[in-house]
Amino acid sequence: MMRIFTIAAILTLVANNAHADDPIVGNWKTELGDTAAIASCGGGYCITLKSGKHAGKQIGTFHGRDGEYAGKITDPDANKTYDGSLAISGNALKMKGCVLKIVCESQTWPRM
């Protein structure tokens, strides 16, 4: 029984460290100058605004690794959710949100 517990604990630590080392995790500056935090959640990553008028609101959920991610992003002002993608390039997070994969908008957020 103790051996199973030890193995489970080691696997949990390895899984948590894999997410901790992912380049997407951290604080990013939005185009409006607010702080957005990206952290591991539910087997993927969540984007939560930490400052500004929508502070505390989760605005995105993404899955992926090695600098390429896909998921959903929410415009907090319009409260509309879009298909999105994220890509890390150095200390920049390039985001794209699309309606029907036809009409897309992009933003680039620098790492803080």
Where are these regions (language model features)?
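Sec-dependent signal peptide recognition
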Residues: 1-8
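Sec/Tat signal peptide C-region and signal peptidase I cleavage site
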Residues: 14-21
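Central antiparallel beta-sheet cores of small beta-barrel/beta-sandwich binding domains
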Residues: 22-85
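Short, exposed beta-strand-loop hairpins at the edges of beta-sheets
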Residues: 83-106
